[in-house]
């Protein structure tokens, strides 16, 4: 078993996580996949890499305990960072932005000497000429980040030469998550499907999103969510 396989096996078996890693294509999970793509396996030897879960049961005494925290400070999986006993057992805490680190330090007095910021990244997207027959807008993140607000604004504008493409679904976090939360946002998705000049595309995987972005003019994202390092905007 490689070091990366060992880490992934543990994350996959962590039942306290709200999503199953293998099914999820969320930002945090994709950042780990990107890290594993470019960093050699040998660099993870002796490392217990914990993803977004300040759960004391995930600590290992014989390894270097590294918590990679991409969640905002108010999330359930982050609360144990308020425990000095837990933080003392961590060797390093990685945050995805200086802003996010500052919020945790303010809330929980996280020690600076254990804190590292590694900002989020995406694969390079080459510049493409955009179509000029109409203006294409896109919303390509989860519904609770501002989709309802966007729909209200877009419908009131009622512009004939503008189309809104909505790529949003609870499916991004996998079957386990979708079965629990999809019904909550069904009315918003139905509104997208039944509105003029709105193309509801549901869940699209990352390569398809990137291809679609090449034709888009504006990322329409009236966010109501505390983004820690917004990958969809990057």
Model-predicted segments: where are they?
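Conserved donor-binding/catalytic core segment of Leloir-type glycosyltransferases
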Residues: 129-146, 151-154, 165
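Short alpha-helical segment that forms part of, or immediately flanks, the ligand-binding pocket
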Residues: 210, 228, 233-234
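Acidic donor-binding loop of glycosyltransferase active sites
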Residues: 214-228
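Carbohydrate-associated surface elements
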Residues: 99, 121
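N-terminal pre-catalytic "stem/leader" segment of glycosyltransferase-like enzymes
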Residues: 1-58
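Nucleotide-activated donor-binding/catalytic signature segment of Leloir-type glycosyltransferases, i.e.
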Residues: 178-207
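Short acidic alpha-helix that forms the nucleotide-activated donor recognition element
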Residues: 205-216
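Active-site proximal beta-strand in glycosyltransferases
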Residues: 47-77, 91-95, 116-118
């Amino acid at each position: 078993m490689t070091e990366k396989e060992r880490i992934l096996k543990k994350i996959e078996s962590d039942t306290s996580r709200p999503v199953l890693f293998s099914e999820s294509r969320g930002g945090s999970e994709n950042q780990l996949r990107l890290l594993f793509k470019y960093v050699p396996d040998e660099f993870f030897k002796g490392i217990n890499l914990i993803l977004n879960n300040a759960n004391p049961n995930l600590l290992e005494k014989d390894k270097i305990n590294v918590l990679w925290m991409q969640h905002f400070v108010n999330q359930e999986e982050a609360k144990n960072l308020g425990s000095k006993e837990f933080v003392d057992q961590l060797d390093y805490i990685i945050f995805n932005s200086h802003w996010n680190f500052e919020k945790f330090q303010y809330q929980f007095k996280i020690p600076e000497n254990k804190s590292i910021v590694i900002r989020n990244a995406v694969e390079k997207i080459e510049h493409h000429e955009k179509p000029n027959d109409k203006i294409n807008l896109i919303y390509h993140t989860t519904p609770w980040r501002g989709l309802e607000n966007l729909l209200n604004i877009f419908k009131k504008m009622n512009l004939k030469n503008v189309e809104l493409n909505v790529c949003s679904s609870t499916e991004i976090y996998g079957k386990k998550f979708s079965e629990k939360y999809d019904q909550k946002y069904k009315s918003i998705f139905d509104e997208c499907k039944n509105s003029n000049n709105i193309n509801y595309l549901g869940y699209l995987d990352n390569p398809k999103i990137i291809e679609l972005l090449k034709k888009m003019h504006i990322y329409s994202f009236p966010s109501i969510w505390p983004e820690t390092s917004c990958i969809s905007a990057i």
